[in-house]
């Protein structure tokens, strides 16, 4: 995978010139976004349990019927699996922040998810609610910088859209 740095250097070299000011600004922007993604990944890692628990609770608050007998969240086992899945999505978002792309979400979270949930009779709306809560609870500068929050929210939106 080529980085912005290698792309800029290759283009300048092919043109027989030094990287221009705009080339260097592009590299600087890429480095700043990478730093913001790493900040968001670190903050999420440090708070994953709290974020996942709050997201799970928000999901159950919006869909209390899930706790009814025979529903998707009616036993302790189902509750644990739902909480585990929410935490799994958040972990994949953290991985995606680190790598700077949606690869981990695409490969380990999104591919085939609708079919699996449909086959198991699991609604996706509660997961959408949980991830939406995680998105809406973030606050700059309380939780992270504005740029880090932008990077984090973009990946949450990506996951939410894939489940919608």
UniProtKB/Swiss-Prot annotation:
Q: Which GO terms describe its cellular component?
A: phycobilisome; plasma membrane-derived thylakoid membrane
Question: What GO biological process, any one, is recorded here?
Answer: photosynthesis
- The highest taxon in the source lineage is Bacteria
The induction annotation reads: By green light but not by red light.
**Family according to the record:** Belongs to the phycobiliprotein family.
Q: Which UniProt keywords apply?
A: Antenna complex, Bile pigment, Chromophore, Electron transport, Membrane, Photosynthesis, Phycobilisome, Thylakoid, Transport
The residues that the entry says bind (2R,3E)-phycoerythrobilin 1 are: 82
Q: Where does (2R,3E)-phycoerythrobilin 2 bind?
A: 139
The protein's assembly and partners: Heterodimer of an alpha and a beta chain.
What is the protein's membrane topology class?
Peripheral membrane protein
Q: Which organism is it from?
A: Microchaete diplosiphon (Fremyella diplosiphon)
Q: Where in the cell is it found?
A: Cellular thylakoid membrane
* InterPro entries per UniProt: Globin-like_sf, Phycobilisome_asu/bsu, Phycobilisome_asu/bsu_sf
Name of the protein in question: C-phycoerythrin alpha chain
Summarize what the UniProt record says about post-translational modification: Contains two covalently linked bilin chromophores.
Q: What is its main location?
A: membrane
Q: Which residues form a coiled coil?
A: none
Q: PANTHER family, alphabetically?
A: C-PHYCOCYANIN ALPHA SUBUNIT, PHYCOBILISOME 32.1 KDA LINKER POLYPEPTIDE, PHYCOCYANIN-ASSOCIATED, ROD 2-RELATED
Classification of source organism? Bacteria, Bacillati, Cyanobacteriota, Cyanophyceae, Nostocales
State the protein's purpose. Light-harvesting photosynthetic bile pigment-protein from the phycobiliprotein complex.
- Pfam families for this protein: Phycobilisome
């Amino acid at each position: 995978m080529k980085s912005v740095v290698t792309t800029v250097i290759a283009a300048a070299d092919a043109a027989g010139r030094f990287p221009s000011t705009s080339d260097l600004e592009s590299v600087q922007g890429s480095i700043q976004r990478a730093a913001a993604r790493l900040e968001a990944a670190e903050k999420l890692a440090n708070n994953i349990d709290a974020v996942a628990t709050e997201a799970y609770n928000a999901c159950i608050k919006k869909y209390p019927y899930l706790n009814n007998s025979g529903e998707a969240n009616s036993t302790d086992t189902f509750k644990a699996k739902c909480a585990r899945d929410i935490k799994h999505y958040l972990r994949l978002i953290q991985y995606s922040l680190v790598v700077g792309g949606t690869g981990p979400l695409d490969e380990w979270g999104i591919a085939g998810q609708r079919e699996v949930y449909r086959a198991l009779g699991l609604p996706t709306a509660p997961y959408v609610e949980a991830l939406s809560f995680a998105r809406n609870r973030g606050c700059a500068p309380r939780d992270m910088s504005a740029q880090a929050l932008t990077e984090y929210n973009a990946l949450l939106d990506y996951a939410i859209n894939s489940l919608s």
